[in-house]
Amino acid sequence: MYKRQAQQIALQKKQLAEANNKVPMSLKAVAEKYKVQPVVAEKASQMNVLALGDSVMVAASTNLQEVFPHMYIDAAVGRQAESLATDLTNAKSKMPNPDAYLIGLGTNGTIKEDEIDAAMKVAGNKPVYWMNVHADRVWAKPNNNLLTKMAKKYKNLKIIDWNKKASGQSSWFYSDNIHPKGTGAEKYAALVANSLTNVEK
């Protein structure tokens, strides 16, 4: 089991490295592949986004990088929100002044209110977009409820409803119904693009 997990981590690190070094696609190709408006593709291509997440984000990292060529992705297998503020601070050394933050955490355990507070302090007044949780885990619904509550506390915290978008779409995922693949990873990236560019579909 440990060997398999180590192989998975190595594979995901390789995938993430490839994503961060990807050659940008043309805007037309992005719009067509991800079924987003050309204006969405254009805006996304110009945004500096600092993304921090868990293995779900790793699974969609190549797609995120195609849509957001200036996105810096720091995603890790098994990551939880307890280290979010520290992880964000460290990631800011790679992108000190992002236009927006994208966070994808909550798959691996419970999110606490003070963890979100600490992360929002690091983000300052910059927009923070948090991808909510789509997973058959006991903490998924409480996490999503907390995120919705915290978005009312912070005007610059926006929740991206991945759980609603992905509901009933088992073909978008690997057998665990958590990690997106193929069409699912494309839909994940498209949802992020439409959310961060604030362009109505």
Regions found by a protein language model. Give the residues of each.
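N-terminal secretory targeting modules
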Residues: 1-48, 94-97, 199
